[in-house]
């Protein structure tokens, strides 16, 4: 169903709070309300939740959003741009995989970050990143043996991550950098310079 005044209020209150944790809570609550809790918000990756939210917003308020975007050529002028939300989609990076081979014998299978992983706001930036990485490890493989995340304690996972080389860690970072994301390219000209 589309947004009602109730959902608009939730969104406005979250915007006023200016906290990521409040925005995430609002996103979760709005999707739950508008889908009659038929979507398992806690289990979906963030990019799917963002896409669902955009679709609900498009059907509720309208498909076209008016934005003011900073012009790159002078870094100070803003241009009025319209974006059709029906044209916004989830972008998948070619070659992306959730399977990361760290060595000839050891690999990890990752899951995509979910909304409950993103609300680690009480932690510092570094702790937040490591928290998301730890929570995204789904399996660890050693040869033909597969170990489930549930088989490891928090201490085991911390020790595993601490034992990785910089190269291994870069492979994990690449997983996050290339994972699917909401993206839409908009072409516009600076109203002052016409570039």
Language-model segments: what does each one mean?
Residues 1-195:
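Short, surface-exposed, charged amphipathic helix/loop patches that serve as local interaction elements
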């Amino acid at each position: 169903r589309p947004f009602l005044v109730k959902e608009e209020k939730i969104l406005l209150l979250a915007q006023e709070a200016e906290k990521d944790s409040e925005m995430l809570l609002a996103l979760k609550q709005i999707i739950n309300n508008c889908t009659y809790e038929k979507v398992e918000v806690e289990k979906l990756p963030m990019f799917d939740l963002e896409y669902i939210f955009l679709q609900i917003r498009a059907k509720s308020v309208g498909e076209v959003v008016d934005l003011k975007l900073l012009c790159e050529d002078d870094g100070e002028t803003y241009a009025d741009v319209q974006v059709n939300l029906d044209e916004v989609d989830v972008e998948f990076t070619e070659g992306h995989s959730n399977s990361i081979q760290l060595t000839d014998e050891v690999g990890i299978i990752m899951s995509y970050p979910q909304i409950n992983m993103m609300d680690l706001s009480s932690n510092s930036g570094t702790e937040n990143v490591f928290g998301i990485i730890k929570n995204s490890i789904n399996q660890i493989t050693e040869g033909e043996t597969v170990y489930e995340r549930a088989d490891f304690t928090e201490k085991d996972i911390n020790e595993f991550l601490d034992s990785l080389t910089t190269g291994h860690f870069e492979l994990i970072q690449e997983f996050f950098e290339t994972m699917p994301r909401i993206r839409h390219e908009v072409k516009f000209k600076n109203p002052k310079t016409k570039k």
